[in-house]
A protein has these predicted regions:
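Low-complexity, intrinsically disordered extramembrane tails and loops of integral membrane proteins
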Residues: 1-83, 354-388
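Membrane-interface extramembranous regions at the lipid-water interface
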Residues: 53-96, 111-146, 193-224, 240-273, ...
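Hydrophobic, aromatic-rich membrane-embedded alpha-helical segments
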Residues: 94-115, 222-242, 273-291, 326-343
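Hydrophobic alpha-helical transmembrane segments of multi-pass integral membrane proteins
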Residues: 100, 140-159, 179-190, 224-232
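Hydrophobic membrane-targeting alpha-helices
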Residues: 103, 107, 153-164, 190-193, ...
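Juxtamembrane/interfacial segments around transmembrane helices
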Residues: 144-153, 226-233, 272-280, 319-331, ...
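Membrane-helix interface segments in multi-pass membrane proteins
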Residues: 154-183, 291, 340-368, 374, ...
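Short, amphipathic alpha-helical segments
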Residues: 168-176, 184-188, 192, 213, ...
Length: 388
């Protein structure tokens, strides 16, 4: 019985023979009886191990090479906005604002609003950089005085005339219709003016936002949509709401880059019918479900260049936020307002991402002029939905 031998060079186990079958090294064993031996094979060249890539050196196993500047994220990767403010810090600002507003008989209100907006934006971060607010209290004060003079005085005079001519029903009714018509025009004017001002005073990486829509176009859209919503007993509302949102988004810019919106009101019509049918049976709770769905739809159809927004908010989360804020305000007799405001901002950002590639390096600043008159009107009619 013969035993196998191991080649001293390549380590191959084989039957005894004069040389290794693999590398041809002499084994010193007896020759095999079968056939002539094969010629010795040349030794295999020794290949050096591959050199590591530059991005693999001096890094931990989980290291990912940096994304090239400009795109900063690839398809499927979401960019998140973060808010680092706290209710306690905002409470300190809020208390001082309240005290100075009372002492100055309301004049400090404009400085108070600027301080809150500066705090909220400076604590909001995107891609490692904070936002900034550049509005001033002087602008807000002058805008308020201008709005009060141009629009407030005529409305006040109409109200006085209604009181004086109350005994003449026809004249009183006509004055009432005139007042309503003026307000219906001023509300969209205020919305556009406020958005134009606020975006023009907001920047990120020293590039400002802007709004370039014409007030007259939005007034036509708003008045027509309001009338059709009333005539159709509310059935036109999702179409009107979507067109209004489209106008405000599609005319907004970040530097020279335009935002886009491609949503359609018909996509929300079915959900709105559900709200109308179940609003009373659910004691209005179905409205939270609709608002969450609308937010997801609106954000999902909003894009900036090649990147698209994505929201994961749900009706349950929105309901819990509202109930929590209501309890907080009632339990603290209103002193918990700063914490409620911080909760709202964090909630708005927590479920929102910007997905897809975006070449931020190609965005350039484009100056746009804006006044605070519309901002003041938005305050009159409570038409603005800003955070401060």
């Amino acid at each position: 019985m013969s035993y196998g031998v191991k080649c001293p060079k390549c380590g191959l186990m084989q039957l005894p023979g004069p040389q290794c079958k693999s590398c041809g090294t002499a084994l010193g064993g007896p020759a095999r009886p079968a056939g002539p031996a094969r010629p010795a094979a040349p030794p295999r060249p020794q290949t050096p191990p591959p050199a590591p890539l530059p991005s693999d050196t001096n890094h931990s196993p989980g290291f990912s090479p940096p994304v090239p500047s400009g795109l900063e994220a690839g398809p499927g990767e979401g960019r998140q906005l973060f808010f680092y403010g706290s209710g306690g810090s905002l409470f300190g600002i809020h208390i001082v604002n309240m005290f100075l507003t009372v002492v100055t008989l309301g004049i400090y209100y404009f400085w108070a609003k600027v301080r809150v907006r500066q705090y909220l934006l400076s604590e909001t971060e995107f891609e490692g950089d904070r936002f900034a607010y550049h509005g001033t209290a002087k602008e807000l004060l002058l805008g308020f005085l201008k709005a009060a003079l141009v629009f407030g005085v005529p409305l006040l005079l109409l109200g006085i005339l209604q009181g004086i001519l109350a005994s003449v029903p026809v004249v009183k009714a006509l004055l009432g219709l005139l007042t309503y018509a003026i307000v219906m025009v001023l509300i969209p004017f205020a919305i556009v003016g406020a958005r134009r001002y606020r975006l023009s005073r907001t920047s990120w990486r020293e590039i400002r936002f802007s709004f370039r829509g014409r007030a007259l176009d939005f007034i036509k859209l708003f008045v027509t949509g309001s009338l059709l919503s009333g005539i159709t007993l509310g059935l036109y509302y999702p179409f009107f709401d979507t067109r209004r949102h489209e106008f405000l988004v599609a005319h907004s810019y970040f530097g020279n880059q335009k935002f886009d919106f491609d949503g359609k009101g018909r996509d929300l019509f079915g959900s709105f019918l559900v709200v109308m049918l179940f609003f009373v049976p659910t004691l209005g709770l179905v409205w939270f479900w609709y608002q969450a769905k609308k937010q997801r739809y609106f954000w999902g159809h909003t894009s900036l260049a090649t990147a698209r927004f994505h929201s994961t908010v749900t009706g349950t989360r929105l309901f819990l936020l509202t109930v929590g804020n209501l309890f907080l305000l009632v339990a603290t007799l209103g002193l918990g307002f700063p914490w409620a405001l911080v909760r709202n901002v964090r909630f708005a950002l927590r479920y929102l991402t910007l997905d897809g590639p975006l070449d931020l390096s190609s965005i350039r600043q484009e100056a746009q002029a804006a006044t605070a008159t519309g901002e003041a009107l938005a305050g009159f009619f409570d038409a603005g939905l800003d955070l401060g």
